[in-house]
A protein has these predicted regions:
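The substrate-binding groove and active-site-proximal loops of carbohydrate-active enzymes
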Residues: 272-295, 323-338, 401-420, 452-466, ...
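Active-site neighborhood of glycoside hydrolase catalytic domains
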Residues: 409-495
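Hydrophobic faces of well-ordered beta-strands that scaffold small-molecule active sites
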Residues: 274, 312-316, 354-357, 436-438, ...
Length: 700
């Protein structure tokens, strides 16, 4: 057993012989519980078969000069474990003894008690950078839901816990009683990673895996630091560790919004995004809904703009001239270019922006929405099989959007893929619109798994995915049109995907959404609230206003989903009963007006340009929302809070999303602003009332 002393208060006990982290100690208190192999390696054959070899299956040789030596029948491994700046830095060098491919290496794995804090006899929580950020407090609940733990493999699922897809940053943390364990892979090349947690016997294992970027039979040498650190605080302090590294290792060319002269003017005007289908009522429906012809929506959009006293963006679904959600060919638009162009021109004359959903790196063999599309077999004729993502054994299969289409995922390493997608997206960007959600269904912006040995990339997931995707995006002639993806853009794509369709609401299936993404990246990119698909909070009057408040506080632009009557749905593809219940449109518009007025005026420097910081404490009552399973409650404070820093000023926004006043108490005295013009200020306040559906700002 080796005791690695990190600080005067922190020590890590590592049992190198048994290959496990035995103890994580802070001020004498043990933070972990039990143990798991502290490293594992996955090897893959060309047939697609694989095996995982863990530290438990390796023979320990020696630990000398901060390097542990292991051997096995498949590989020899040198593991650097060294104290640096109050943390343990880990690196693995692997000598491959086989002709198999080293697919990934898992490092620094540790276990905690098998129940989290919201379970009987549970403790602790997991900070998880999934879909803009999540605090997980009930492991059994997570495992009972659609976003449970899944071992990633081919073919990709769009729920995989993969960076840079649903996972936006390269770390994860465990919190217990104000102390945390941070795992981070500080990789400036941003290779593909699996960042996750799962049951391990009767415990929970927290781990990170890096894909190795090597070919069959090749060795692997980790080119970055894997960091294990104990810290005091909450999720903000875990994020601070990562933010410190990120700030010194940003993606090339990434600029803060305040410095970025290439962002269009409308970005700073915070338009309300109005999502609606040109036809149909949900993903797989195309029946007339009253919103076609295109211009039918203009009076509804004008009314929304007038009542919110701000800009709006019409973000269209089901506009494709081929079939809804049937990539890659979508142009010309439904009804023809002339009619669409006339709509865009008239919308712009009324200061209404126009955006389009587009379906990313996919190929449609047969639409399930319009079964007559396509009318030929282009897959065979064009030899598309040569450019689709495939398994090691040549199998081709896709699990993405099967209700909408039968098809495949395209591999961005192939020049034909780039050429097809660039050609199609160029047509959209030349149509005088303002925004394209270019990579809907490619969550976070990245491609899906491909193991082909014929595409010119290493025959497994790896850094080539983000490199080739960025090349694809760079080749689009945007003409000033902003691009985005589904879920917030992951770290490698921040420069090119600057306005994306957030998916924080998916985290209700896992735990509690937290604005982790905004805390890390808000200075560089503002997104929008998103179409809220699968937002499964019970339909109470403060359901939608809560989600508006959450997005506002996270620094994002707001969204409504409009139906053919001009009413607002709780979410796109809304299936939460009662299905016919709609948002109170009048109160929603009034609240949006209040929020956007703050965002465009008194709070603009913070909410548009600022760096999110840890907020000061606020005491208030709580609200409870019943979740989809009919027995679990999501508990939220009666006000939503977020704090920002800009130009040496710090401000916190406190939002009451309820239809009743809320009494609050600040942890310290502050100056309080009650209006977005900053004309009504009360000095040195600590307790006060926040009016229904209102915002206050405190400076501290």
């Amino acid at each position: 057993m080796e005791r690695m002393k990190l600080t005067t208060e922190t020590a890590i006990d590592i049992d190198f012989k048994n290959g496990e982290i035995a103890g994580v100690l802070y001020k004498g208190k043990q933070l972990n519980d039990g143990s798991a192999p502290m490293f594992s390696v996955k090897l893959r054959k060309k047939t697609g078969e694989s095996r995982i070899v863990s530290a438990k299956e390796c023979t320990f040789v020696a630990f000398e000069n901060n390097i542990a030596f292991y051997t096995s029948e498949c590989f020899d491994l040198k593991l650097l474990v060294k104290e640096k700046d109050g943390a343990l830095v880990w690196k693995a060098d692997i000598k491959n003894k086989t002709q198999d491919l080293l697919e990934w290496v898992e490092l620094m794995s540790f276990t905690v008690t098998g129940k989290l804090q919201d379970e009987p006899q549970g403790q602790g929580s997991i900070i998880y950078p999934y879909n803009e950020g999540c605090r997980v407090t009930n492991m059994a609940y997570r495992e009972s839901m659609p976003f449970r733990y899944i071992e990633p493999d081919y073919p990709s699922k769009n729920t995989f816990s993969i960076f840079p897809n649903m996972i936006s940053a390269q770390f994860i943390a465990y919190l217990l009683d104000g102390v945390g364990i941070y795992l981070g892979m500080h990789d400036s090349e941003r290779t593909t990673k699996h960042v996750d947690f799962c049951y391990y016997d009767d415990k929970i294992k927290v781990f990170m895996r890096a894909f190795c970027d090597v070919d069959y039979g090749e060795d692997y040498s980790m080119p970055f630091d894997s960091v294990f650190k104990v810290f005091e605080g909450d999720w903000y302090q875990a994020a601070d560790i990562y933010y410190h590294w990120f700030s010194a290792n940003k993606p090339q060319g990434l600029q803060k919004i305040v410095e970025n002269v290439n962002i269009p003017k409308w970005y700073s005007q915070s338009p309300l995004v109005v999502v609606y289908p040109l036809r149909g009522k949900h993903d797989t429906d195309t029946t007339p809904n009253g919103l076609y012809p295109y211009k039918n929506a203009l009076p509804l959009l004008e009314d929304i703009a007038q009542k919110t006293e701000g800009n709006v963006m019409a973000l269209l679904m089901h506009w494709e001239g081929t079939a809804p959600w049937a990539p890659p060919y979508v142009w010309p638009p439904f009804g023809g270019e002339e009619e669409f162009s006339s709509f865009v021109d008239e919308a712009h004359s009324k200061e209404i922006l126009v955006g389009l959903y587009c379906s990313g790196m996919g190929w449609t063999n047969r639409s399930q929405v319009l079964k007559e599309y396509p009318d030929g077999d282009d897959f065979e004729r064009l030899e598309i099989n040569e450019i689709v993502c495939e398994n090691s054994n040549g199998e081709v299969k896709s699990t993405i959007c099967l209700a909408q289409r039968d098809g495949f995922d395209l591999c961005p390493a192939m020049e034909r893929t780039k050429r097809i997608l660039q050609t199609e997206l160029n047509k959209l960007c030349a149509s005088n619109i303002d925004y394209v959600q270019a990579l809907d269904q490619n969550h976070g912006g990245c491609s899906y798994f491909c193991y082909s040995d014929k595409h010119g990339h290493t025959p497994a997931p790896g850094k080539w995915q983000q490199i080739e995707t960025n090349k694809l995006l760079s080749g689009i002639q945007t003409n000033g049109v902003l691009l985005g993806c589904e879920s917030a853009a992951a770290e490698p794509f921040l420069k090119q995907l600057q306005f994306s369709d957030n998916r924080f609401e998916l985290n209700y299936y896992i735990g509690t959404p937290i604005p982790l993404y905004a805390y890390l990246f808000h200075e560089y990119v503002n997104n929008f609230m998103g179409n809220q698909i699968c937002a499964m909070l019970e339909k109470r009057e403060n359901n939608f206003t809560y989600r508006l408040a959450y997005s506002f506080a996270a620094g994002d632009m707001l969204t409504v989903v409009m139906n053919g009557d001009g009413d607002f749905q709780y979410a796109w593809c809304d299936y939460t009963p009662p299905n016919d219940k709609l948002v109170n449109k009048k109160s929603a518009l009034e609240f949006i007006k209040t929020l956007n007025t703050w965002r465009r005026f008194g709070g603009k420097e913070f909410l548009h340009y600022g760096k999110m910081i840890a907020p000061i404490g606020v005491k208030c009552s709580q609200e409870r929302f019943l979740l989809e399973d009919g027995k679990t409650y999501f508990v939220a404070d009666a006000v939503v809070c977020a704090a920002y820093e800009f130009a040496d000023r710090k401000a916190q926004f406190i939002v009451n999303y309820n239809f009743y006043p809320v009494e609050i108490e600040l942890e310290k005295v502050c100056d309080v602003y009650f209006d977005s013009a900053l004309s009504h200020c009360e000095k040195s306040k600590k307790t006060f009332t926040v009016a229904p559906l209102s915002v206050i700002m405190v400076e501290f």
